[in-house]
Amino acid sequence: MGNIFSPTHLIIILLLILLLFGRGRVAELMGDVAKGIKAFKKNMKEEEESIEDKVEMADTSQVINEESQQSQPLSVKRAAIRRKASSDSKGGKASIAKKQRVK
């Protein structure tokens, strides 16, 4: 008993399907199958583009975060210097006043 999927068996099966359903019905079914495949490919392409967009957005936001982190220390340093200068000037006056009271 040979292979069930030999070319002659497939031809006989296809002829039986054609006889049972008719040409129009088979053509309609094949059209529906083609539409389904086309819709599937379209959705796969949209999903891939969506993933690429998300990756691109993540890369962009990472670059922006890195740039802001690089520029942030300068402003933080300036603020720290200002705080230190203001606390030194206030603290300096207070310590001088304390020293004078002690004497």
UniProtKB/Swiss-Prot annotation:
Keywords linked to the UniProt accession: Cell inner membrane, Cell membrane, Membrane, Protein transport, Translocation, Transmembrane, Transmembrane helix, Transport
Gene Ontology terms, MF aspect: protein transmembrane transporter activity
GO terms of biological process kind: protein transport by the Tat complex
Cited Pfam families: TatA_B_E
Cell location: Cell inner membrane
Primary location: membrane
Transmembrane segments: 1-21
Region (Disordered): 48-103
Keyword Thylakoid attributed: no
GO CC, alphabetical: TAT protein transport complex
Polar residues: bias regions: 59-74
Membrane topology, from the record: Single-pass membrane protein
InterPro entries: TatA/B/E, TatA/E
Matches recorded under NCBIfam families: tatAE
Function: Part of the twin-arginine translocation (Tat) system that transports large folded proteins containing a characteristic twin-arginine motif in their signal peptide across membranes. TatA could form the protein-conducting channel of the Tat system.
Homology family: Belongs to the TatA/E family.
Assembly and interaction partners: The Tat system comprises two distinct complexes: a TatABC complex, containing multiple copies of TatA, TatB and TatC subunits, and a separate TatA complex, containing only TatA subunits. Substrates initially bind to the TatABC complex, which probably triggers association of the separate TatA complex to form the active translocon.
Name under which the protein is recorded: Sec-independent protein translocase protein TatA
